């Protein structure tokens, strides 16, 4: 029969996994060995109460995989380094271009900073909000000054203009002497007054045209007068020797619709 000390020597608490006990078959010794095996199993479990309380960590077996991966990484590292060096040796251009672009960008940024610091150099001239001055027509330097007519002279000139718009040489000389004016002053005043009268007359005619303008559009017209259709037809038909008898045309009226003008018969 196997003794407990022998069982303890065969199984260690640090081993993981189920352990096989070499002992006799079923019997009292076999039962004790099974109980010892269960006790060893319980004590060897990493999540058992004893293991958690004692804070013992089971030894981890060194797996061969990390060693293999480390050796593979060690062998690949020189290959990568050699490939990187060859790529650098074959293509030196791309390495130089970033530095060139960086230098160009820095120069551009410096130019932009200088442009921002010196606004008066590149900025357009400021706009002045002063009101624009109206440029008056320049008169001739040798122009004669305007004649300051008095009120009595203006009334006499207006009265004479209403009587007669054109004065003869004798009338102008007599009239100018009566007003203490020169003949040239009287002649120029009458010329200006006639031009003013013409402008007033044209304005009055334009007002009359606007007042007499029909409400119908100018493109709309009837081929015959609405007031006397029979009379107009008889006049036009009498001048032609072989005219057809004119049929009586009923009087028509106009009415306005949202779309346009229509005609309807008057009853």
From Swiss-Prot:
Keywords: Craniosynostosis, Developmental protein, Disease variant, DNA-binding, Homeobox, Nucleus, Osteogenesis, Repressor, Transcription, Transcription regulation
PROSITE patterns, A to Z: HOMEOBOX_1, HOMEOBOX_2
Chain residues forming the annotated DNA-binding region: 142-201
Keyword Lipid biosynthesis attached: no
Molecular function GO labels: DNA-binding transcription factor activity, RNA polymerase II-specific; DNA-binding transcription repressor activity, RNA polymerase II-specific; RNA polymerase II cis-regulatory region sequence-specific DNA binding; RNA polymerase II transcription regulatory region sequence-specific DNA binding; sequence-specific DNA binding; sequence-specific double-stranded DNA binding; transcription cis-regulatory region binding
Keyword DNA-binding (UniProt): yes
Composition bias, Low complexity: 62-71
Location of this chain's protein in the cell: Nucleus
GO terms of biological process kind: activation of meiosis; anterior/posterior pattern specification; BMP signaling pathway; bone trabecula formation; branching involved in mammary gland duct morphogenesis; cardiac conduction system development; cell surface receptor signaling pathway involved in heart development; cellular response to estradiol stimulus
Disordered: region residues: 1-71, 116-147
Pfam families in the cross-refs: Homeodomain (PF00046)
GO cellular component, one term: cytosol
Basic residues bias: start-end ranges: 136-146
Family: Belongs to the Msh homeobox family.
Subunit structure: Interacts with MINT. Interacts with XRCC6 (Ku70) and XRCC5 (Ku80).
Protein's job: Acts as a transcriptional regulator in bone development. Represses the ALPL promoter activity and antagonizes the stimulatory effect of DLX5 on ALPL expression during osteoblast differentiation. Probable morphogenetic role. May play a role in limb-pattern formation. In osteoblasts, suppresses transcription driven by the osteocalcin FGF response element (OCFRE). Binds to the homeodomain-response element of the ALPL promoter.
Disease field: Parietal foramina 1: Autosomal dominant disease characterized by oval defects of the parietal bones caused by deficient ossification around the parietal notch, which is normally obliterated during the fifth fetal month.
Protein name: Homeobox protein MSX-2
Source organism of this protein record: Homo sapiens (Human)
Lineage: Eukaryota, Metazoa, Chordata, Craniata, Vertebrata
């Amino acid at each position: 029969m196997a003794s407990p000390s022998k069982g303890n020597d065969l199984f260690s608490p640090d081993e993981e996994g189920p352990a096989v006990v070499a002992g006799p078959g079923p019997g009292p010794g076999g039962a004790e060995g099974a109980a010892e095996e269960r006790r060893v199993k319980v004590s060897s479990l990493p999540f058992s109460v004893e293991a958690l309380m004692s804070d013992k960590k089971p030894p981890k077996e060194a797996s061969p995989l990390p060693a293999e991966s480390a050796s593979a990484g060690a062998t690949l590292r020189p290959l990568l380094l050699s490939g990187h060096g060859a790529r650098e040796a074959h293509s030196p251009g791309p390495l130089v271009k970033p530095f060139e672009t960086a230098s160009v960008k820095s120069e551009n940024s410096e130019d932009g900073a200088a442009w921002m610091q010196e606004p008066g150099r590149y900025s357009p001239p400021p706009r002045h909000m002063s009101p624009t001055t109206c440029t008056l027509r320049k008169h001739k330097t040798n122009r004669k000054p305007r004649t300051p007519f008095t009120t009595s002279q203006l009334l006499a000139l207006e009265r004479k203009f209403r009587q007669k718009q054109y004065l003869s040489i004798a009338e102008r000389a007599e009239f100018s002497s009566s007003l203490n004016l020169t003949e040239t002053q009287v002649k120029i005043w009458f010329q200006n007054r006639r031009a003013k009268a013409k402008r007033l007359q044209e304005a009055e005619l334009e007002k009359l045209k606007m007042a007499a303008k029909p409400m119908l559009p100018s493109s709309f017209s009837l081929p015959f007068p609405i007031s006397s259709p029979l009379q107009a037809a008889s006049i036009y038909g009498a001048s032609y020797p072989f005219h057809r008898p004119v049929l009586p045309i009923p009087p028509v009226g106009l009415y306005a619709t949202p779309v346009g003008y229509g005609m309807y018969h008057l009853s």
